[in-house]
A protein has these predicted regions:
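N-proximal low-complexity "stem/linker" segments adjacent to membrane-targeting elements
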Residues: 1-29
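Catalytic core of nucleotide-sugar-dependent glycosyltransferases
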Residues: 203-210, 216-244, 265-282
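Short aromatic/hydrophobic "clamp" motif used to bind/position activated sugar donors
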Residues: 88
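Membrane-interface aromatic/basic loop that binds lipid-linked glycans or pyrophosphate carriers
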Residues: 266-314
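A conserved acidic beta->alpha catalytic loop
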Residues: 26, 33, 41-51, 68-70
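Donor-binding/catalytic cores of nucleotide-activated saccharide
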Residues: 72, 93-197, 207-219
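Glycine-rich, basic loop-to-helix element that forms the pyrophosphate-binding segment
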Residues: 67-83
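Acidic helix N-cap motif at the loop->helix transition within catalytic regions
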Residues: 18-21, 35, 46-55, 96, ...
């Protein structure tokens, strides 16, 4: 009988030889040992492939998959295809998790939740990425509604621990070839989940670095992919029967779109991404509606007014 570990920890690896050891050490030294660590070498051009093989040779819980460079989404999907654990964690190869993470998650595993919710902290800025709502097991759509009402719903997949069979049953995978894959994956997962529970455990440490995969990406593709994800999610949300949830989700997409515009990551690419109809049709909250109307009158005016308000608050 093949032993199935409690946790599968999936780590896509690409061009992180200076950070990989800290990441892997935070995994192999977990105080709870019934885990497997799946390192997916995504065609890394540096010393990472050899490092991965060394870890696997030293610890039978470490498994390595080498594949041609295919991007973060495909690497995570590869890890999922090889995973055997009851629950799955995603860890980026330049980040770390607390050594007692799996130990502290065990009581929540016993509750058979589809998704266990955790929190993270951005090392350097000390900015905490957390969830504002605490409850017993609730349906995923209910949690989304409450979290959006509280204004606290981080989309990063690394903050959530997923029951592996739940992901399989609902065919939940990451969309290949795009940045911001979490922006689509996380809401889809929550809308499919029957039982989600918040752990209150802050376990994940984001290590921000200037040469990271995300920071170096071409900003145009970054903006375009997020824009496309917003439009795809709009189609998904419009099919929801729960009107209150639908309104909150659509409103959150308008807020995300306007934030993207405000950050200067849309308007510099011309009219292709200026989508007044989307903003006007999907704004729901009175504050968002006011912003949408101003944006519809004049996107540059919206940008200047928003900047002025930010400066006044600073």
């Amino acid at each position: 009988v093949i032993h199935k570990p409690v946790f599968s920890i999936i780590v896509p690896v690409y061009n992180v030889e200076n950070y990989l050891n800290a990441c892997v050490q935070s995994l192999i030294n977990q105080t709870f040992s019934d885990i497997e660590i799946i390192l997916v070498d995504d065609g890394s051009p540096d010393n990472c492939p050899a490092m991965c093989d060394t870890y696997a040779a030293a610890d039978s819980r470490v498994h390595v998959v080498h594949q041609p460079n295919s991007g973060l989404s495909v690497a995570r999907n590869t890890g999922l295809a090889h995973a055997a654990g009851s629950y799955v964690l995603f860890v980026d190869s330049d980040d770390i998790i607390n050594l007692d993470t799996c130990q502290r998650l065990l009581p929540f595993v016993d509750k058979s939740a589809d998704i266990i919710i955790g929190d993270g902290i951005s090392v350097g800025s000390r900015k905490k990425l957390s969830h504002g709502y605490t409850a017993a097991c609730v349906r995923g759509d209910m949690y989304l509604k409450l979290a959006l009402h509280e204004g606290s719903m981080p989309m990063a997949a690394v903050l959530y621990i997923y029951r592996r069979e739940f992901l399989q049953e609902n065919r939940l995978v990451f969309k290949p070839g795009i940045l911001h894959e979490d922006e689509q994956f996380t809401p889809r997962a929550f809308l499919s989940a029957e039982r989600v529970i918040e752990s209150g455990i802050c376990f994940y440490h984001y290590i921000t670095r200037d040469d990271s995969i995300t920071t170096q990406q071409d900003l145009r593709k970054n903006a375009a992919d997020l824009y496309d994800s917003i439009l795809e999610l709009t189609d998904l949300y419009k099919q929801l029967a729960d009107q209150k949830l639908k309104n909150r989700l659509l409103d959150s997409l308008v807020t995300k779109y306007l934030s993207l515009f405000q950050a200067g990551r849309l308007q510099q690419y011309g009219k292709a991404y200026i989508h007044k109809r989307f903003v006007l049709c999907n704004a729901r909250h009175p504050k968002t509606v006011c912003k949408a109307l101003l944006f519809a009158i004049s996107p540059p005016l919206y940008w200047h007014v928003n900047n002025w308000v930010k400066q006044r608050r600073a």
